[in-house]
């Protein structure tokens, strides 16, 4: 029954005075041993020739996360075993375009799935944290979908059908603990600094390009093409750096609080990242996004989950229960 303050004091600050040093397993409610992920644990469409390198980069990153939640990692290891989209003859593909998501189409006459597309980042760059968080987020969505109530249909995902988790989203809650609010403020300030710095570089590059155009050293079509390219690259760099800022994953924690607020937190500017009230009008989406964010953070940023646990212990308990229930269903 170690309190969060004692946990932080002992295992973050390194002060163990007056504490009985328990094993990690005892502290983490006797969770299973952390076992490494392997490529054969994933669905075939994530390990084929086209996707093998990307999935291996994800596996290598996750296996290096020593403090990852063993139960959540165990659930990701069941992804291949629980796959029921292509296994049921439904077309399924993986791509790396913009707008990361699990997209699907269905037949309106009977609600049956027509096809599914998993859109995830192509892992690249010096810091993969933000991209790994996004990939784990989307792959948790995929597992949530695998465990839908009727495998033939598109709806009834496991999280939104889970009574305990769903109960948290029947009413909105806009409360944010002081330490988390301070974290969000610092994150917003850092993202503003990143944005200002990259936009300043963009203005300089644009000015140089404009001078070349007026000097007639490049054509208008070349100018337009180059301008669109540097503008796109600046936008991508802002997103890349902000998602990695302050250790990465803070955007996911913000989205959990946005879901709890029904989207009003993002609408009001209390969080920088979130889906907003138009999206979260669908109560089921609040549970789905929260589980996906929890899954990613439990692997990459378990310290942020401990902050969430301190503020919303019953929510984290419900999320842990969802993970356990999905593991049981998968035979784990």
Summary of predicted features, one role per range:
Residues 1-39:
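Hydrophobic, membrane-inserting alpha-helical segments
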Residues 37-47:
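N-terminal low-complexity, Pro/Thr/Ser-rich intrinsically disordered segments
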Residues 45, 55-62, 66, 70-332:
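Active-site-flanking segments in enzyme catalytic domains
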Residues 50:
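Non-catalytic nucleic-acid-binding interfaces of large nucleic-acid enzymes and RNP effectors
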